[in-house]
């Protein structure tokens, strides 16, 4: 009985200690708590610029949302700028609309 209880405790601890790699969306913290402002270059539109910014920090893609580059599927170690949840929801919704 004690051995099986110990096995259960060890199993629970093991499960809790497993680090799960998750992806998240947001405005990446590029420098000093600020994200990258959308801009065009000779080669890129605003959208292409943001895609390049996001991919350079291991994001899946990005777009220009409310004047700033918003990235999708950023790695956990990438800092993101704190913004209201409604802003994040709007930018995520905007991406879903583009995919349809």
From Swiss-Prot:
- What cellular component terms from Gene Ontology apply here? extracellular region
Which tissues carry this protein?
Answer: Expressed by the venom gland.
Q: Which domain of life is it from?
A: Eukaryota
Record keywords: Disulfide bond, Ion channel impairing toxin, Neurotoxin, Secreted, Signal, Toxin, Voltage-gated sodium channel impairing toxin
Question: What are the cysteine partners in each disulfide bond?
Answer: 38-64, 50-69, 54-71, 65-91
Where does the signal sequence lie?
1-22
Q: What is its main location?
A: secreted
InterPro entries tied to this protein:
Scorpion_toxin-like_sf
Q: Which GO terms describe its molecular function?
A: sodium channel regulator activity; toxin activity
Known SUPFAM superfamilies for this protein?
Scorpion toxin-like (SSF57095)
Ranges for the LCN-type CS-alpha/beta domain? Answer: 24-92
Localisation: Secreted
Would you identify the family this protein belongs to, as annotated?
A: Belongs to the long (4 C-C) scorpion toxin superfamily. Sodium channel inhibitor family.
Query: What is the recorded function of this protein according to its Swiss-Prot or TrEMBL entry?
Result: Putative sodium channel toxin.
Domain text: Has the structural arrangement of an alpha-helix connected to antiparallel beta-sheets by disulfide bonds (CS-alpha/beta).
What protein is this chain from?
Putative sodium channel toxin Ts26
- Protein's organism: Tityus serrulatus
Q: What is the lineage of its organism?
A: Eukaryota, Metazoa, Ecdysozoa, Arthropoda, Chelicerata
């Amino acid at each position: 009985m004690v051995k099986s209880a110990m096995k259960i405790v060890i199993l629970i601890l093991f499960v809790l200690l497993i680090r799960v790699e998750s992806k998240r969306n947001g405005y990446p913290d590029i420098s000093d708590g600020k994200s990258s402002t959308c801009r065009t270059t000779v080669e890129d539109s605003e959208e292409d610029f943001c895609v390049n910014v996001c991919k350079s920090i291991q994001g899946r893609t990005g777009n220009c949302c409310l004047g700033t580059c918003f990235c999708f599927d950023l790695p956990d170690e990438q800092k993101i700028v704190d913004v209201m949840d409604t802003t994040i929801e709007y930018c995520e919704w905007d991406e879903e609309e583009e995919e349809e």
